A protein has these predicted regions:
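Extended assembly-interface regions of large multimeric machines
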Residues: 32-35, 39-133
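Structured, contiguous alpha/beta core segments that scaffold functional sites
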Residues: 2-68, 129-224
Length: 224
């Protein structure tokens, strides 16, 4: 009987799973699709992003959500570095760790970490979280500058800089999907960025020209 009960329960579970997949009045509100996420948003991405930004500007609930998100994820002091380098005897290198942390704290100050000198690293963290939640993605570009004290810097790019209409099948087996060139294993290789913001009326001549940037110089975070 125990074997029969087990088989019966398995059949019941299978039956329930098939029922859940069948259309009925209980599931009419569920929108089903078999296409990829990229295909689903490819032709509507810019409009969806514009609507989300409008809500972030004008909807009190959306504004409050972004404020709470930044406050609870980043916090007042932000995410900080604590170096715990150890020597060959597994002892903490106090002097080296202090040197590393001091250098990090110096780089994190306003004027040192971004190419335009306008943000501190805490500001960057807040902007990262807000942009990710509002726009669905974040683009950060890496730069090695001539600054002798802090040569490495970052630049936040508006998501609109990425040409989502750039799509192409490559002969080598790779693809360009929504402005991102990838190899046959979907590893990002290059990013097709507009030379100027595509909606900036002051740069119409360059706004449609591309700057191809290596994926090694781009941090592209997005909500899947």
């Amino acid at each position: 009987m125990a074997i029969w009960d087990r088989l019966f329960k398995q059949r019941q579970r299978s039956k329930r799973s098939y029922i859940a997949a069948k259309p009925s009045r209980l599931f009419n509100d569920f929108k089903t699709t078999s296409i990829s996420a990229d295909s689903a948003i490819r032709f509507n991405l810019r409009e969806l992003r514009d609507k989300s930004r409008d809500q972030a500007r004008n909807n009190d609930y959306a504004k409050r959500y972004l404020q709470l998100l930044v406050t609870n994820v980043v916090g007042q002091k932000g995410i900080r570095l604590q170096s715990k380098a150890r020597n060959e005897r597994n002892q903490l290198e106090t002097v080296a760790n202090k040197f590393i942390e001091d250098a990090w704290n110096k780089w994190s100050k306003k004027g040192n970490c971004t190419v335009d000198g306008k943000l501190s690293f805490i500001d960057c963290q807040k902007l990262f979280m807000e942009s990710l939640a509002r726009d669905g993605e974040v683009l950060i570009r890496y730069f090695n500058t001539n600054d002798p004290q802090n040569p490495f810097k970052i630049q936040f790019l508006d998501a609109d800089y990425l040409d989502e209409k750039k799509n192409q099948t490559k002969k080598d087996g790779g693809n360009i999907i929504m402005g991102v060139e990838m190899d046959e294993f979907n590893k990002p290789l290059q990013y097709y960025l507009y030379a100027e913001h595509p909606n900036d009326v002051y740069f119409r001549k360059k706004s449609k020209q591309h700057e191809i940037v290596s994926a090694d110089d781009i941090l592209h975070a997005y909500m899947a």
